[in-house]
């Protein structure tokens, strides 16, 4: 039959994506360095596990994995969509066609002109087990969360406005779990690998994945409302379509280059920005047209009557989540909006924007989560909830913690008080939902109570978030070999710092507290490909209540410490000093240009080599073409009517989200005669601050901080994950009966 033939043709397309994926893995393990993707993200000494995960280390491989996940999700969707299959699969094939078009523009199989003997290597901060599993879980979440959009579009086209929601609920549950797990895995990776002491930095690219998860959460609650009460049909269709559009928008922000100066995760423009922008506009127009056509036939939300407490709770929670998603989306899109209004001066918002707008909403959300298990779908829910409050201590604890919010805000100050209030409300929400989970499990079985366990996990997460932000702030310390220093309650002693021929730096320390035996700790710094600094991994001392976080920022081996500074370079007369930089994040390097205050010239640092003591620059005069220069220390080059001098390297810095920033001090002056030659016989060296000589033996710079209750955060993530998994099992069982 024709439908059966269409199914087999689609399976054939899924097998084709599988074959392409197997081919890419074969190239990665076969060290096919004539393939640009293999050369850019692997090397001969890369362990097999990271050769496997290099598949999604770059944008081209990520697109292919997303297409692979979407292809096989579609195979299951074709069976699960039942009578909506023709319309749903038509839309799904359009989604897969978009991914295929992006792969044709950015193919992971593009060839180089020659075959290098070795690859450039994988960024050290990507060589981590958490990062090996974080991206595929995220892309699986993107694929699964797209299913409700396909079913919603099918429901609109076929006028089956109830049927699509029944079929979508299991997929929305699985998408919520997968995308949420991906976000958590990224947070764990950031905390344990990047060394900035946090797990969420409000980076625009991180936010762009959070927003569809938030709108998907609204959709999930709305689908439950529609299943139980037959309401929320209009907002459900809107949020199903909106979540898919936000997934496309997230991809556009990440890969269009618009966030290149605002995110350490962003890729440069990959050539698909026009395609993605066009796809977003086209899909949005199609969705809007179908909605306008069918909207009058979609039942309006019913008026909530007195006593329908749980339904009101769902609506209020959805409004709060929508408000959080709006503010996160607004802050994330600020670089794009300001770039359109002022192309030469795009700007972004600071993390404080998200904290200020999100904290009150988070407090309100926790109150609603704490009240949820005390309500029911019964019209008499208000009386039942009141009786529950009187009978149960968890309910009283939730109400009591809510009453303490204003008192604590005034007593402890707004920020600290808000964090303590957040922790108390999280405790109340967790307690109330755990109590309801146990009670419902005994009455109806464990899977039926999974949502309450997930809510309890969310409450615990906020307890951990609040506690970890109330710890001792970073305290920096610099140690020379053989030196001991006390930081907080800890004593740190540096035994040695050594470098290897491969450029890896190893520091050996003894860390002790009081009369406890000293811990022997080994810290490593691995060079980032391209000679653009080092990636340092922190040491975390874990205990039941608090993590102590030791984050290295600089490690100088003994042989480099022993060198004496060469005579300082004499700057050009009348020169202005600029400090262009290269910023290296988990997704690669990006230049950070420096412009003269009068706009006469911009200097971009393209590459730097500490070993040879040279830099590669692109000098862009205001009234002339760009000029590419390679300069050694002290050397002067000519760019139009300007003399450009490389004076010395700036300090290596590590940003708040783990990115490395390497700069160079460049002097620019009006040209005077012939540019002088570079100083001869100068030994390449690394500058010491202020020209001071360091004692031989090596040195390390470390910051120490504490993270109270962060273990509760990870526990909450695990509890929420288990509860979500139980809910997914329940919804798919129910879906099989629909």
Label each region the model flagged.
Residues 1-738:
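Solvent-exposed, non-transmembrane regions of integral membrane proteins
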